[in-house]
């Protein structure tokens, strides 16, 4: 299991609670691990945190840009969804049947409204890392994909996650993995 310890919702929740992001993520990581222990689930051999892999994420994103699977615009880097022929296969969603603006705000800087963010600029009040595209932070889908790619042999056997993550999260992980290593992220998705 990996730990997302930086994303927009975490930044917002930490600001609303007036506590450091690290304190908030530690609290929920501890709760998660306690719940898993209560259920008699063995602890993972490794439990990577997204912030420990930002350099890997920057290299991963740069690789996707070099392969013409992603593009930069105004400090944002987007994955170009039409570049992945199998997009929508896991969730049984046709690209041309998706309604622009139904899930995320319509953006005039995207080539295609289904394109998703790999890197986004950070304001002075938000955490950020130096990158070829400016100070910013990785997108959530990229965090999970890169931590998996660094720590596991791709494709790994089983990828699990909540039904609520099927689209767009798992679909976007698959698209990035296929673009990066020409392989699905895992053999089985549950």
What does each model-found stretch correspond to?
Residues 1-40:
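N-terminal, positively charged nucleic-acid-binding surface of large information/translation enzymes
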């Amino acid at each position: 299991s990996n730990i997302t310890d930086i994303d927009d919702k975490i930044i917002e929740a930490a600001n609303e609670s007036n506590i450091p992001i690290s304190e908030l993520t530690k609290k929920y990581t501890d709760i998660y691990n306690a719940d898993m222990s209560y259920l008699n689930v063995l602890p993972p051999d490794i439990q990577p945190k997204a912030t420990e892999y930002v350099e890997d994420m920057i290299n991963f994103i740069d690789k996707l840009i070099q392969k013409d699977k992603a593009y930069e615009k105004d400090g944002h880097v987007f994955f170009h969804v039409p570049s992945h022929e199998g997009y929508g296969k896991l969730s049984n969603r046709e690209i041309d049947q998706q309604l622009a603006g139904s899930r995320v705000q319509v953006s005039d800087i995207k080539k295609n409204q289904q394109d998703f963010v790999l890197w986004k600029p950070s304001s002075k009040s938000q955490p950020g890392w130096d990158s070829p595209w400016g100070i910013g932070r990785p997108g959530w889908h990229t965090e999970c994909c890169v931590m998996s790619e660094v720590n596991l042999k791709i494709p790994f056997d089983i990828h699990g996650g909540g039904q609520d993550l099927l689209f767009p999260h798992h679909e976007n992980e698959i698209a990035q993995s296929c673009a990066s290593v020409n392989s699905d992220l895992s053999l089985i998705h549950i």
